[in-house]
Amino acid sequence: MQRRDAAALRRLLTQHAEFRPFINAPFFPFNAPALVACAGDAAMVEVLLEVGADPNKRSEWWAGGFHPLHVATGVAAERLLAAGAVADACAAAHLDKPELLASLLAADASRVRERGGDGQTPLHFARSRRVIDLLLDAGADLDARDVDHRATAAEWMLDRSRGAGRYDLAQYLVERGASADIMLASALGRTDDVVAMLRRDPALLDEQTGRGRYAEMPPSSYHIYFWTIGSSRSPMDVAAQFGHDDTLAAMLPFATPVQRLRFACRRGDAERARALLRDEPGLVASLAPNDHRAVTDAAWNGDAAAVALMLELGFDPAMPGHDAGTALHCAAWQGSVASVAAILGYPAGRALLTTRDAHHGGTPLGWCCHGSLHGPAGGEHAGIARLLLAAGAAMEEGDASDEVEEVLMEWREGHR
C-alpha cells in the first residue's frame, strides 16, 4: 500500500483471501479504509474494487470523513463513479463537475453548507471559478472554516509558492469578498491590506504559522497554513516566499530590529544580519528565549544556510521546536546532512547528542531513524546516522529504513 504497488497488492489479496474481510476497515492514516488511502492511484483503485472495496466507504475521521471521491481525480474518479460511488456536493466541487453540483443543490439547497473530509465545505473543494460562482450564488459562506484545521477555503488553496496549487482561486475568493488575515494577504501580495493591518497592530509581524492562533488546538490540528505555507513562517517570510517584494518592502518600516534579524537569518542573508549587528552589537544577547527557536525552526525546514548563519551569530540550538526537538533532532529527522554537520561543528550542538526531547523521549539518532521512514523523500538519513554515531551518539533501538539499518549494523559490528 505504501509503495502503491498494485501488482503486489493483487498478488497478496489473491494468495491471502483472509485479508479481504478487512478491506473496508479503517486501518490507514486518519482512520481511512484502503480505498480512501489510495484513491488518487487508478491502478490501486482497480485492485481494491476487484476484491470488494466499498466505493462509498468514508474515513472515520472525527472532524469529517473523506469519501473516496473527495480524494480521487481523473481516471481513478471515473472508475469509482462507474463502480457506484455517489458524489456529494463536496465531491462534485472537487471533481469540478458544475452540472452535477447544480443538480444536487437544486434538489437540496442546504447542501451548499454540507461538510466533507476534515469538515470542509464544498467551497473548500472548489477547483474552478465556475464552481465557486455556483456555490456563492447558492449562498455559500466565503469565510466558513473547516473543523480540523480552522481555515477558510482561500487559506486551503495555497501551496507554498506563488501560482502553485489553487493560488488563482484564492485570489478570486478574496476579490469576491473573502477575508484575508496577515498571512493570506502576504501570500497574495495584497500590499494595501497588509499595511492597513500593520498600522492597526504592528505586532502582527511576530505571528508565525504553526504557533499562537495557528497552533494545534486539540482536538483540532494545526491551522492549514502549516501545510499550505509551511511551519514557523512570519508574514515577512511569507511575502518573500511567495515572491512579493513590494509587499515585503512595505512591511519593513514596521519591523523591529529583532524581527529584521530573524528575517535576515531565516533568509540566510549573512550580509544583512551582520550589518544589523554592527548597528546594534547587543542584539543577539537581547533575544528572548523564544527568539532563539528560529535556528531550530530552520533546522526543521532543512535550511542549512540559515542554520549555519544563526549558529555563527550565537543562536542557541538547544531551544525546543517542533515536537520539543532541538535543532539537532529536527535536522536529523528532516534528513539534512548539511544542517546536522553545521550543528555538530559547535560544542553547543554536540552537547545535544544525548538529549531526549520532552514529547517523544527520543535522541537525535532516534529522530533520524524515524525520519528515515516517515520524513521527507530524498532525505540523507544514512549519512546523518554516520555523522551522529561518529560524533558520539549512543546506539538507538527502533525501526529505520534499510539504508539506516545498514549503517547501524556496520557500527555495531565495528564496535563490539
Regions found by a protein language model. Give the residues of each.
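Ankyrin-repeat intra-repeat helix-capping/turn positions
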Residues: 4, 40, 96, 127-130, ...
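Conserved ankyrin/ankyrin-like repeat signature
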Residues: 8, 43-44, 76, 100, ...
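Repeat-mediated protein-protein interaction surfaces in helical alpha-solenoids
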Residues: 11-20, 70-75, 162-167, 211-222, ...
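Ankyrin repeat domain, specifically the short helix-to-loop turn at the C-terminus of the second helix
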Residues: 13-21, 47-54, 79-85, 105-111, ...
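Ankyrin-repeat boundary/"N-cap" motif
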Residues: 21-39, 58-71, 86-93, 113-127, ...
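Ankyrin-repeat-protein effector appendages
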Residues: 76-94, 103, 159-188, 196, ...
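Ankyrin-repeat and related helical/solenoid repeat scaffolds used for protein-protein interactions
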Residues: 143, 337-345, 349-387
